[in-house]
Amino acid sequence: MQYVIPAPRQAAIDVVGTDAKFPVRRIWCVGRNYADHAREMGHDPNREPPFFFAKPSDAIVPNNSTIAYPAQTKDLHHEIELVICIGKGGKNIPQDKALDYVFGYALGLDMTRRDLQSDAKKLQRPWEMGKSFDESCPITAVQPADKIGHPKAGAIWLKVNGEVKQKGDLNQQIWQIDEAIAYLSTFVALEPGDIIMIGTPAGVGPCKAGDTLEGHCDGVGDLKVTYRAA
């Protein structure tokens, strides 16, 4: 097929154990999927269930990258998250079959321009500019599910310059992996290459130019990204 302009670059993630890549189609995110994080953001998890939003696939940043501090913000926040990588497409997926649609798992950061997000919320406007910006999704290589299984519990944490800022356990998620997949598939058809960032534990906070962020999730991997000094 010929195009009238250069075709966009295909976003892709490394896969552990192979030179082949995981092509990324869409990035879905689950908001407020840990009760303690919902509360720190001023919301009642018993009254306001988690929800979905999206990032562009070209926001992905490879593990161990050094990147620029993003434009138009003075309050960049870290949110460490388990990432589900979809390997088979479907819609209205039954919850008891949902794990069959998973290719593997990774660890990612949903970087957030919190000031832009907060301002948009106050004005009742969409807050894509707070979430969907360049290099806002650092991510590890994918661990195939047929190698590691489906993580239901395990420590997940994030350090900034060696100091622990976020700490939780995967079993604290309000929606577990199968629930999130099944529910999202009632809104949109999931396709191979879609990824789902399934929420962050409490402790989100700011980082600045020159900071190094290190994340970990038991059984999934370790993530590191550095923001270039100003």
Language model features with spans:
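Extended, compositionally biased flexible segments
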Residues: 1-97, 101-102
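Catalytic-pocket segment enriched in acidic/His residues
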Residues: 2-21, 33, 37-45, 114-230
